[in-house]
A protein has these predicted regions:
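Soluble acyl-CoA-dependent acyltransferase catalytic core bearing the H(X)4D motif
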Residues: 1-7, 26-39, 44-404, 408-450
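Generic start-of-chain signal for non-secretory N-termini
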Residues: 1-22
Length: 450
């Protein structure tokens, strides 16, 4: 029986009906041209035939006399028929019905009496495609690592071997055990590091003040920064990467700058149509890789985060892009000039509000540390396949928190950027409007720049 790391345990202790603590992913697949009508069923049966289950997918929280213990126990007899399920979307079988089903699945808690993961193969789409919704508890694996794990089940060849996440060959850096890969994974490591020396946080504060960077808890309060309920709504859409690149080329910005500005314009319009746009600009928490290209296989804390001024108080889209770009460049320049101890301290200070937001009742008592998390997760740039089916889209589905009622996560998939926006149904009404505003924001940037 292995003890659960203290920071991982927070995700179990803080979980409630209102606060599910799992990450998800929705993938869309196009069946092979020669596939018969039973292709989805046959794929499901192939999944169930993979009985060799990795240790990570056998772990569940231990109990003592019915009470939870902060330790993992290993399930010897994993019932795959429970964890791997077959679903069908209701008529008329469109994308809206698929995403609504995924939203419902994403709202439901994982059963702690079993290993903390589920995979749902979803059929019944009117266009003949099928989907896979996966979810895994954040105490087990962080969001970026889960995304990478799912990507490893894919192949670049249509005839490639069909692989499943619970039975993958080990690599020198296995995503299932790489807890430093994502933003919340960074919270695990960075908060532990910060706890080892109070001088780290003093160092971080000194760096922020000296460089005049945005400090945590300086963001305005918005309708997103409130306590949330348990019901989730997810909306998804894909945009051609070439459209973003055209704006990048015309303005000298980065792809991430354009994506952040696109998101900023959408948030500005969404809040403005509800008379809820604050005078001060919204602040986004943006995960940032601190790993150089030549140390991919190195362990340790290599993910930080920056606070980005989204310029939502600026009406002109190009001026807003300049604000976002300057904010991101300044933060990156500061990180590049820091020592390792300063980098660790600054990252800990930036990420720590994520863990603090898990504490019940804290949100109404403090100003928001930031208004929203916007994550850009690298994905495959070439066409990918699973059991011969072509991957059409991958929509990340992250975790809203108290004080963070909406989350925007996107990933690269071939020539597209796939956006997954997850929000609290109660706190963020008419979430699909945010997709319309994202399109309008990109169109405004194109009109002004290209």
């Amino acid at each position: 029986m292995d003890l659960i790391a203290p920071i991982d345990a927070v995700f179990l202790l803080a979980e409630s009906r209102e606060h599910p603590m799992h990450v998800g992913s929705l993938q869309l697949f196009e069946a092979p041209e020669d596939a018969g009508p039973d292709f989805a069923r046959q794929t499901y049966e192939k999944l169930l035939s993979c009985k060799d289950i990795d240790a990570t997918f056998r772990k569940r929280p231990a109990t003592l006399f019915g009470a939870p213990r902060m330790a993992w126990t290993t399930e010897d007899d994993v019932e795959l028929e429970y964890h791997v399920r077959r679903q069908a979307v209701p008529r008329p079988g469109g994308t809206d019905q698929l995403v609504e089903l995924a939203s419902s699945l994403h709202s439901a808690l994982l059963d702690r009496h079993r290993p903390l993961w589920e995979i749902h193969l979803i059929e019944g789409l009117a266009d003949g495609r099928f989907a896979v919704y996966s979810k895994m508890h954040h105490a087990l694996i962080d969001g970026v690592s889960a995304q990478r794990l799912i990507q490893r089940t894919l192949t670049s060849e249509p005839a490639g071997e069909a692989r499943v996440p619970w039975n993958l060959p080990r690599t020198p850096r296995t995503p299932a055990t790489d807890s430093s890969a994502g933003l919340l994974g960074a919270a695990r490591n960075l908060l532990s590091a910060a706890a080892s020396g109070p001088t780290l946080l003093r160092t971080a504060r000194a760096v922020l003040l000296e460089q005049q960077l945005t400090m945590p808890f300086e963001a305005p309060r918005t309708m997103f920064n409130v306590p949330i309920g348990g019901a989730r709504r997810t909306v998804v859409r894909s945009w051609p990467l070439e459209r973003i690149k055209q704006v990048k080329k015309a303005t000298g910005a980065t792809v991430n700058d354009v994506v952040l500005t696109m998101s900023a314009g959408a948030l500005r319009s969404y809040l403005a149509e509800r008379d809820a746009l604050p005078d001060k600009p919204l602040i986004a928490m943006v995960p940032m890789s601190l790993r150089s290209p030549d140390d991919v296989a190195t362990d340790g804390v290599k993910v930080g985060a920056v606070l980005c001024n989204l310029g939502t108080d600026v009406a002109d889209p190009l001026d807003r892009l300049q604000v976002v770009g300057e904010s991101m460049r300044k933060s990156k320049d500061v990180y590049s000039s820091l020592s390792s101890i300063q980098t660790m301290a600054l990252s800990a200070l930036m990420v720590s509000p994520i863990a603090l937001s898990l504490l019940p009742g804290l949100v109404p008592l403090t100003n928001p540390a930031f208004n929203i998390v916007i994550s850009n997760v690298p994905g495959p740039r070439e066409p990918m396949y699973w059991n011969g089916a072509r991957l059409d889209a991958t929509y990340p589905m992250s975790i809203p928190f108290d004080g963070q009622a909406v989350n925007i996560t996107l990933t690269t998939n071939g020539d597209n950027l796939d956006f997954g926006v997850v929000g609290c149904r109660r706190s963020v009404p008419e979430l699909p409007r945010l997709l319309d505003h994202l399109e309008n924001a990109l169109s405004e940037l194109e009109s002004a720049a290209v």
